[in-house]
């Protein structure tokens, strides 16, 4: 008999009466009055092994095994005694009567129990190998595998070709810092790890491969946020001779296919499409969570002439905004709740949080409860009540500041209230999946510090055809042929139609204050390629880590990556990054300069 004939978790009634050979890890050992029970675990699940003292040598071995010993069991599959069936296990109707037990490798005492759900992330990442043995992590990584397989199946059927692009490439400005790799052969010069395969996949379209994809690692040396990793995985795609709508349709179908085949979820037959300007106006975010039913009400124009400077000053400012958020039944919120929300919005730059409780709308001013009502005239109060559609028992929150602060703070408050226990109890948030496309993004953003425009996405995104004329005269008016797929408030994919004409690409570089000499030095290979009959093309990249996190219901993308980094970009398992010896540095012609310590 071979070392293993079956997986533990797949031993069921169909094997009754058969002798099997199993390999796995001891989940738990129990001694019940002379009979030893072992819960044996492998990647497919658990099976109960019964060790009877009638087989003395085997029983002596069983007495010595402990949690996480790696063992081999040979035995007979039989029904469990009446009353001992475990309906929670796939193998719960049977057990294996052990004939032979071999310890393949003992284990020292693990630093934690695998069923402990209260472990710190530091402990889990330091002992990642043991953490990965836990059923939830096994499930997550197998789900990740299935998502990747289904993406490949779909793309293969659609005629896409899997082509690898370089990991050592040229450093080009794409927003975040590059991870640099020194060249030993070319002293003083550096490769960069790719932030994305963006330029290479465009070159593949010029080279007539028509449809490309790869599931690939990307690298960004940026300040990490809660769900960012210095290295992450993209489902990266590019296609020729398709317009924006056709590209969106193609990849919308892919996401529907993946969700249906991996977690049996039917996404909307047609994803709604929302312009960027509408998303910002209604939700203060370019990735709105449509499960939350709350929306902004625009009040900027109505507050320009009020005596209340907190509202009128931003209402009259060039970059100011005044917006309201009506919360149905919110009048029941306590002053403590409101104070908590006030502190919360300060995180996003808000100076405070104005509010009005609507107790009896019919009484006008007298039916309102708020510290700000006395500062507003009747016409402005009427405008607030009419525009928000407020009813008795509602509360209205206000934000008045620079538009960015209003959008960030009130948008975060919208999500916090919607997903709170209050929000759930009052039907302010729906369950399920709410996908949408956000389109018509600004092509450029103005950088006040550098006094110039920067690319909102990347400098290879095509402007809308009707906005080509603004590239040189008024870049701020340009909208891009860019699109993001958003799901439950997460951007899971983003892409665009690309610039395929050299003259347009050069105009975009000039709008970004990238001169001809700099453009040639950094992007000459692209500009040259575009002159050889480059086809119209576009594409998209999906964040595999993020998609799997959502599907798994995980708390963090670190729960769906086998060996992730911490928020400080450290690998606690291998202790990377780490110093290297002086000889290696000399070979690379590098001398370290330690960062200056701040004066005490």
Curated annotation (Swiss-Prot):
Enzyme Commission numbers on file: 6.1.1.23
Organism of this sequence: Burkholderia multivorans (strain ATCC 17616 / 249)
Keyword entries, A-Z: Aminoacyl-tRNA synthetase, ATP-binding, Cytoplasm, Ligase, Nucleotide-binding, Protein biosynthesis
UniProt protein name: Aspartate--tRNA(Asp/Asn) ligase
Function: Aspartyl-tRNA synthetase with relaxed tRNA specificity since it is able to aspartylate not only its cognate tRNA(Asp) but also tRNA(Asn). Reaction proceeds in two steps: L-aspartate is first activated by ATP to form Asp-AMP and then transferred to the acceptor end of tRNA(Asp/Asn).
TM stretches of this protein: none
Assembly: Homodimer.
Residues the record lists as binding L-aspartate: 174, 220, 457, 498
Keyword Ribosomal protein applies: no
């Amino acid at each position: 008999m071979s070392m293993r004939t079956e997986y533990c978790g797949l031993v069921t009634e169909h094997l009754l009466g058969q002798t099997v050979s199993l390999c796995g890890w001891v989940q738990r050992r129990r001694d019940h009055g002379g009979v030893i029970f072992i819960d044996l675990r492998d990647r497919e699940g658990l099976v109960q092994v019964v060790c009877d003292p009638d087989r003395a040598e085997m029983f002596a071995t069983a007495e010595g095994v402990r949690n996480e010993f790696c063992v081999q069991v040979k035995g007979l599959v039989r029904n469990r005694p009446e009353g001992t069936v475990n309906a929670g296990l796939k193998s719960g109707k049977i057990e294996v009567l052990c004939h032979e037990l071999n310890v393949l490798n003992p284990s020292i005492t693990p630093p934690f129990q695998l069923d402990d759900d209260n472990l710190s992330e530091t402990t889990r990442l330091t002992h990642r190998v043991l953490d990965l043995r836990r059923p939830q992590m096994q499930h997550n990584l197998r789900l990740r595998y299935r998502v990747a397989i289904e993406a490949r199946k779909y793309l293969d059927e659609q005629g896409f070709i899997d082509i690898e692009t370089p990991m050592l490439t040229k450093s080009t400005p794409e927003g975040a810092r590059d991870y640099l790799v020194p060249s030993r052969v070319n002293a003083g010069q550096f490769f960069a790890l790719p932030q994305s395969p963006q330029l290479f996949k465009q070159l593949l379209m010029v080279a007539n491969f028509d449809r490309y994809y790869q599931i690939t690692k990307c690298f960004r040396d940026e300040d990490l946020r809660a769900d960012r990793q210095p290295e992450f995985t993209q489902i990266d795609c590019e296609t020729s001779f398709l317009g924006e709508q056709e590209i969106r349709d193609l990849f919308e179908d892919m996401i529907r296919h993946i969700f249906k085949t991996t977690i049996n979820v039917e996404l909307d037959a047609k994803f709604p499409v929302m312009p960027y300007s509408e998303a910002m106006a209604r939700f203060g975010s370019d990735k709105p969570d449509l499960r939350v039913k709350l929306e902004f009400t625009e009040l900027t124009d109505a507050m320009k002439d009020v005596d209340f400077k907190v509202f009128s000053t931003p209402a009259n400012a060039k970059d100011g905004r005044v917006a309201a958020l009506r919360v149905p039944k919110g009048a029941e919120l306590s002053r403590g709740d409101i104070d908590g929300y006030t502190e919360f919005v300060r995180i996003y730059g808000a100076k405070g949080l104005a509010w009005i409780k609507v107790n009896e709308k019919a009484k006008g001013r007298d039916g309102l409860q708020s510290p700000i009502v006395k500062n507003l005239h009747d016409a402005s109060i009427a405008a607030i009540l009419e525009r928000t559609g407020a009813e008795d028992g509602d509360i209205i929150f206000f934000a008045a500041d620079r538009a960015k602060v209003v959008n960030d703070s009130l948008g975060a408050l919208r999500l916090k209230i919607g997903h709170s226990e209050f929000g759930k109890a009052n039907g302010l948030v729906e369950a399920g999946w709410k996908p949408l496309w956000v389109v018509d993004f600004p092509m450029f953003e103005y950088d006040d510090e550098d006094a110039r425009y920067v690319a909102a996405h990347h400098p290879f995104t095509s402007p809308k055809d009707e906005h080509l004329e603004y590239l040189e005269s008024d870049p701020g008016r340009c909208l891009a042929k860019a699109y993001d797929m958003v799901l439950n408030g997460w951007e899971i994919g983003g892409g665009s139609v690309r610039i395929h004409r050299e003259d347009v690409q050069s105009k975009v570089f000039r709008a970004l204050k990238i001169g001809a000499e700099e453009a040639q030095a950094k992007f000459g290979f692209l500009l040259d390629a575009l002159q050889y009959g480059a086809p119209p093309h576009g594409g998209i990249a999906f964040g595999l880590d993020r998609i799997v996190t959502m599907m798994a219901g995980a708390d963090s993308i670190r729960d769906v990556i086998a060996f992730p980094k911490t928020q400080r970009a450290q690998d606690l398992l291998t202790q990377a990054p780490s110093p290297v010896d002086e000889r290696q540095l000399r070979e690379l012609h590098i001398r370290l300069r330690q960062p200056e310590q701040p004066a005490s």
